[in-house]
């Protein structure tokens, strides 16, 4: 059927819903099969897809997989019932991360703290609480103000009692709070960002995402693993999310994770330079572990380059998850489990789902 202006939004809506229904399941026993994985997760609802990732040559499990539910409510029910134990092993379920997001700084880091940008002067703590408490139990809310003038800097933090609310919230790029557009991020301290950044230079291969030259690495315990980046690191060879123009875009002096770094060096989220967005203006700096630079540019409402096409959460059977070299199977390469030499270059495939 020929696509029309009416059918395209419907198809996009359907695809976006599917993206929110996918869970990544890490730490699987090598004995776990699709059947046992499906049998376990079907206690929370109907699965539309279930896969255990395997080496294309040996057919040995890589220790992780994906399940896709028929509704977002079923995903929420499954996550609310953690911990999960399959075949005698406690596994790690997480919301699947989009392909475009997977190479960005902190995309796979587990945190309970959420950064909220775009907070206006008329937005108070209770507005944030009313909006975000539907996602999970909130521990603390902070709206950052200027120490001298007392005026709001335009950003704040919401801390939950669990990481899953944060994972769920950041899947949705745009949020409207008190009538204003807001944007959310995982809030990583300077130490956490330095750990993420330093992992790029560690031994072993990369995460299996991003540049297909990575590969050769493991997602879990084993030689040269523990989220260590290879020659191209966690995303591309130019660092974490190079060219990611922060809040409002522009030339930047470090941007949101360009080559100067997302937490160290001159720029980035906790760096000592221009920082989160482009030069000048923005959300100010010098807050606790989060700032030595500015949190963004004065053109926050431009939303930088965030207006992207819908992303694919988790590998899709016809599109796959990342690089362009590994065409060895529908879900590509890379390793998750202990040991092993890793895949041959990320999640393979050029096409989209």
Curated annotation (Swiss-Prot):
The modification Dimethylated arginine is found at residues 203, 213. The modification N6,N6-dimethyllysine is found at residue 104. There is a cross-link at residues 22, 104, 112, 120, 137, 152, 168, 173, 186 (Glycyl lysine isopeptide (Lys-Gly) (interchain with G-Cter in SUMO2)). The modification N6-acetyllysine is found at residues 168, 173. Residues 21-104, 112-191 form the RRM domain. The modification Omega-N-methylarginine is found at residues 38, 203, 213, 228, 238, 266, 325, 350. CDD domains: RRM1_hnRNPA2B1, RRM2_hnRNPA2B1. The modification N-acetylmethionine is found at residue 1. A motif (Nuclear localization signal) lies at residues 9-15. The disordered region, when incubated at high concentration, is able to polymerize into labile, amyloid-like fibers and form cross-beta polymerization structures, probably driving the formation of hydrogels. In contrast to irreversible, pathogenic amyloids, the fibers polymerized from LC regions disassemble upon dilution. A number of evidence suggests that formation of cross-beta structures by LC regions mediate the formation of RNA granules, liquid-like droplets, and hydrogels. This is Heterogeneous nuclear ribonucleoproteins A2/B1.
């Amino acid at each position: 059927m020929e696509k029309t202006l009416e059918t395209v939004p419907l198809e996009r809506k359907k695809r976006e819903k599917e993206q929110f229904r996918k869970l990544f399941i890490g730490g699987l026993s090598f004995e776990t099969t699709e059947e046992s994985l499906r049998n376990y997760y079907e206690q929370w609802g109907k699965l539309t897809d279930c896969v255990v990732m395997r080496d294309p040559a040996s057919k040995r499990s890589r220790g992780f997989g994906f399940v896709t539910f028929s509704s977002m409510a079923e995903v929420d029910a499954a996550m609310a019932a953690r911990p999960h134990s399959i075949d005698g092993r406690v596994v790690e379920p997480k919301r699947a991360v989009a392909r475009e997001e997977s190479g960005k700084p902190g995309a796979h880091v587990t945190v309970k703290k959420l950064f909220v940008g775009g907070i206006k002067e008329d937005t108070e703590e209770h507005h944030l609480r009313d909006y975000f408490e539907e996602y999970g139990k909130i521990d603390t809310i902070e709206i950052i103000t200027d120490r001298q003038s007392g005026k709001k800097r335009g950003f704040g933090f919401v801390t939950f009692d669990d990481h899953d609310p944060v994972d769920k919230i950041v899947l949705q790029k745009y949020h409207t709070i008190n009538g204003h557009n807001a944007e959310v991020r995982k809030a990583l301290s300077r130490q956490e960002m330095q750990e993420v950044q330093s992992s790029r230079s560690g031994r072993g291969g990369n995460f299996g995402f991003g540049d297909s030259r990575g590969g050769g690495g493991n997602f879990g315990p084993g030689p040269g693993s523990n989220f260590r980046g290879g020659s191209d690191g966690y995303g591309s060879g130019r660092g974490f999310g190079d060219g990611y123009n922060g809040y409002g875009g522009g030339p930047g002096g470090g941007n949101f994770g360009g080559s100067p770094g997302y937490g160290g060096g001159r720029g980035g989220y906790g760096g000592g330079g221009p920082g989160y967005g482009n030069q000048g203006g923005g959300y100010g700096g010098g807050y606790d572990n989060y700032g030595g630079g500015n949190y963004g540019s004065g053109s926050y409402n431009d939303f930088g380059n965030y207006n992207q096409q819908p992303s694919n959460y988790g590998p899709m059977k016809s599109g796959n998850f990342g690089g362009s070299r590994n065409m060895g199977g529908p879900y590509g390469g890379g390793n998750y489990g202990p040991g092993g030499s890793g895949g041959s270059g990320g999640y393979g495939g050029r096409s989209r789902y």
